[in-house]
Amino acid sequence: MESTLKRTWAEIDLDHLTHNFEVIRRHVGDKVKLLGVVKADGYGHGAVEIAKRLEQIGAGYLAVSNIDECEELRDSGVTLPILMLGFTPADQTARILQLHMTQAVQSYDIAKEFSDRAIALGGKMTVHVKLDTGMGRLGFSCDEAHFDASLRDILRVLELPGLDIEGVFTHFSVSDEDTAESVEFTKLQHERFARMIEKVETQSGFRFQLHHCCNAGGIASYPEWAWDMVRCGIILYGSGDLAEKMGMQPVMSLKTRVATIKDFAAGEPISYGRTYFTQRPSRIAVLPIGYADGLHRALSNQIEVLTPYGRAKQVGRICMDMCMIDVTDLPQVKSGDEVEIFGEHILCADDAALCDTIPYELMCAVSKRVPRVYRLNGVSVDKNLQPL
């Protein structure tokens, strides 16, 4: 691993994860379950290691986006309940039961097929009913035009013998935005959510064990809507405006090292396409990180990185495996020096804004060839979170 670290790596600070978890817990209260969203390999941080730490510190649930992600967690020994947020084909019912996965259901037809298959297999599937309150995606539609039909279908779902109906949830689309229009729409979504729950529970006499609607934006701005559980996604990883406002700490730091330094006269081109020419006699350092590692090519000639002696501008097009930085004003920089691409000092969200995207995308883009190095209680740990 040491030889690999001399190239490019991602440091995952599990102490920062713990800090962020506790900030959320204090914000929503001790009685609310915290669900850790670990889909997309834990937003690029490593789903297994993140899930194991969340299990240690008191998370009540996890969430994934597909059945393979759930299987990876179960194979690693994770025992927490796991909610599959999206679509799973009904022909995967046997795997769902085997993995003890909680499945979201978004229509009567899919719910009935799950129920029928579960009964045939001699089992019962735990499910959460998904409500579409304005996202325009999966879920029973709760707008005025479809409300009554969705209510009837949900009441029918409650009667399916092969399902154990545990929860109900929805997803906010603009809860992270504070414009008047966005605030009003988020309030409308919550009103629709609460109204459907009230109608279902009143007419059926059934009570969902878990009600959840708050994502990162909901947690930060509407903690009074925490219900029984909140879903901690990007905010848990300490990235974005909301995380910064709440005092979260970045969990991932993407780092590399200076491979070599070359001297150039003024007017010399750097990298593909000759998009950058040196403006003066310059010292240009080569970093062994490129877009195949997850450093977006769209960030070429835009970002700064942090050396041990200060910030340096990235220059020229980012290549597949390398990029260049201008260290003319940092004469102390030398080959082997550690460089932060983003992390505690260079915020991922700031880089994301430069290429018109969100920090989720940049973190998820950090590729498999970049080793993740985990730290807990200030020391490096292995995949079982034991000190190395």
Predicted features along the sequence, with ranges:
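Flexible, glycine/charged-enriched surface loops at secondary-structure junctions
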Residues: 31, 206-210, 214, 349-356
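C-terminal accessory subdomain/extension
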Residues: 263-388
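A structural signal for short, hydrophobic beta-strand segments that form beta-sheets
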Residues: 84, 258, 314-315
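C-terminal helical cap(s) of enzyme catalytic domains, especially alpha/beta-barrels
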Residues: 14, 71-77, 242-251, 359
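Conserved, mostly hydrophobic/aromatic
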Residues: 17, 39, 73, 107, ...
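Short hydrophobic/aromatic-enriched beta-strand-loop microsegments
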Residues: 79-88, 102-106, 124-130, 230-231
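Active-site loop/helix belt of alpha/beta enzymes
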Residues: 5-6, 40-57, 111-126, 133-257, ...
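A charged N-terminal "starter" segment
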Residues: 1-102, 116, 164, 371, ...
